[in-house]
């Protein structure tokens, strides 16, 4: 991910990257980055021929959340060339960057070989994303859900977790999620979080492809939780 707008612009220009806007078509038509091709998040799996596998690709959405879902999904399909711009359209426009309303058609690319089981799992995840984009809501909603019995997972690194975590949270570091499947509940709602929400958005597709469709993400994550003065625990 490239979170700084100037660094993002430099990276796109230097690499002649392909820009993918994964917002809904109506959002895209109201304004987008010049040259960005619109592939709404839920349709990514059906439009892989619009995404190159061998040149840099940057994905963005409105706030960064959908871009994380898209980046993680595409990487599971073998697109290691995909990065994201987490500030999204909000960050781009707040920085006073130019807005285009001219639709970009993009090119057609050869789709790489993907294991059929993985393609099916990822595409099933993408096409069934509900309204709300699998977000657990704001801090108030998350606190109420935890109070009501939702399980909590922390996808940050062990040192971050050791410095303090949301009460009852179990640490399942992002890069090691598949090794923790035995500790992920299947019979209750699960809310996962990180520090800022970015890693949480990357984690959602991983949990769901592993079969845990009861997992939602807390987009505000630990920063929003502590900013709200909510309690924390330490090991």
Q: What do the PLM-derived regions correspond to, one by one?
A:
Residues 1-18, 25-56, 65-151, 158-191, ...:
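Rhodanese-like catalytic fold shared by cysteine-dependent sulfurtransferases
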Residues 61:
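Active-site neighborhood of phospho(di)ester-bond hydrolases with catalytic His/Asp-centered motifs
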């Amino acid at each position: 991910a490239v979170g700084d707008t100037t660094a993002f612009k430099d990276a796109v220009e230097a690499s002649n990257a392909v820009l993918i806007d994964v917002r809904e078509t109506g959002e895209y038509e109201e304004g987008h980055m010049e040259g960005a091709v619109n592939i709404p998040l839920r349709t990514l799996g059906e439009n892989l021929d619009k995404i190159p596998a061998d040149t840099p690709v940057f994905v963005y959405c409105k706030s960064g959340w959908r871009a994380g879902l898209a980046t993680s999904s595409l990487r599971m399909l073998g697109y290691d060339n995909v990065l994201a711009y987490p500030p999204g359209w909000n960050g781009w426009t707040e920085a006073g960057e130019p807005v285009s309303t001219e639709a970009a058609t993009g090119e057609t690319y050869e789709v790489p070989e993907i294991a059929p089981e993985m393609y099916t799992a990822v595409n099933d995840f993408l096409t069934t994303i509900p309204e709300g984009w699998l977000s657990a809501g704001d801090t108030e909603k998350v606190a109420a859900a935890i109070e009501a019995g939702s399980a909590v997972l922390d996808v940050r690194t062990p040192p971050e977790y050791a410095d303090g975590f949301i009460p009852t949270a179990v640490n399942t570091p992002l890069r090691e999620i598949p090794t923790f499947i035995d500790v992920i509940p299947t019979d209750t709602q699960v809310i996962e979080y990180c520090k800022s929400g970015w890693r949480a958005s990357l984690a959602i597709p991983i949990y769901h492809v592993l079969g845990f469709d009861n997992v939602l993400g807390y987009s505000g994550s630990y920063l929003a939780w502590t900013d709200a003065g909510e309690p924390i625990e330490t090991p």
